[in-house]
Amino acid sequence: MDYKKYRILYSPRVIDSLDKIYQYIAEEIDSVEAARRKVASIRKDINRLEIFPQAGFDVDEKFGKKLDPHYQTRGLTLSKDYIVLYTIVEDTVRLAYLLPSKSDYMKLFKTKSRYD
């Protein structure tokens, strides 16, 4: 069975978050190998969105606020420790944020627009 395959577009903010995760693990835990594994695991989870981008939860509904004025924002838990927020635009999944799941990300978005 053929599935439609979506393109994944990483925002500079998400790339920066991946870099910070890698640096933190490599420096604070002193393990480059653990840092590589964690980033690879996150990217593997993100790649699932190529086949089924609707898998994530409705962020706009959960937050009670539309984060993107033009598209529905969705969220997906990654590697147990992170959440990626994204929109689906035609055949592209646009990754907007990569956040620690233990952070108070809901509070962050109560006052901040995606375009800030």
Over which residues does each language-model region extend?
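Generic structural signal for secondary-structure transition and capping sites
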Residues: D30, N47, I51-Q54, D81, ...
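Arg/Lys-rich, positively charged N-terminal/basic patches that mediate binding to nucleic acids
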Residues: M1-D45
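Enriched for short, Lys/Arg-rich terminal
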Residues: R74-D116
